[in-house]
Amino acid sequence: ALSGGTYANLRTQVHKVEREYRPETRPLGEDTLADALDIIRRWEHGHCRFDDCGLRDDRVDEEALLLRRELEVTGIVLYLDGRPTAVSAGFFLAPGLFDLAVAKSVSTAQGVSYYAKRELFRRLDCAAVNLEEDLGIPGLRQMKNRLCPAAKNEIWEARPLWNG
């Protein structure tokens, strides 16, 4: 439960989704895979690329879902008013520790990404969730900070001191 003042903003956004839409959450499976892949493919990439090598975050997500059995990926697809809107999925790194590897939404409605994550997390038996790196993207970093993390790891980047 998101109790206490720390989570007031998250509760407000989640309740807004519940008030303004008919949300339905379905487990990621054979019957929802096509919808999940469609969400990932329709997701706006913006500048979410890894440096200059042309790798795209959505391709990683797509592969994770296509290999969900081998990777033991579990997840949900969120439908708003009957339309596939968001997908959240990941896998356990250890007992009680879940890694959220896939989190995409095709809606600009406030609170949808929080709602989808909450719906996945409430189905899991875990004490902690790893949200992975934010790639230096300000909007993603802000969203993750609003989830009130218990801890953050410092990210380091190695660069050569010479050319050649």
Give the ranges of each region predicted by the language model.
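A short linear-motif detector with a strong N-terminal bias
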Residues: L2-T6, G54-D57, A109-Q110, G136-I137
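Short, conserved active-site entrance elements at the starts or edges of catalytic domains
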Residues: D31, D35-P84
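Glycine-rich loops and low-complexity Gly/Arg-rich segments
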Residues: H15-R19, R49-C53, L124-C126, N153-A158
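Short, contiguous, pocket-lining structural segments
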Residues: G5, N9, L28-T32, E70, ...
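Short, hydrophobic/aromatic alpha-helical segments in well-folded domains
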Residues: Q13, I39, D61-A64, A116-L120, ...
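Acyltransferase donor/substrate-recognition loop-hinge adjacent to the catalytic core
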Residues: A1-D51
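Aromatic (often tryptophan-rich) hydrophobic motifs at membrane interfaces
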Residues: E72-N163
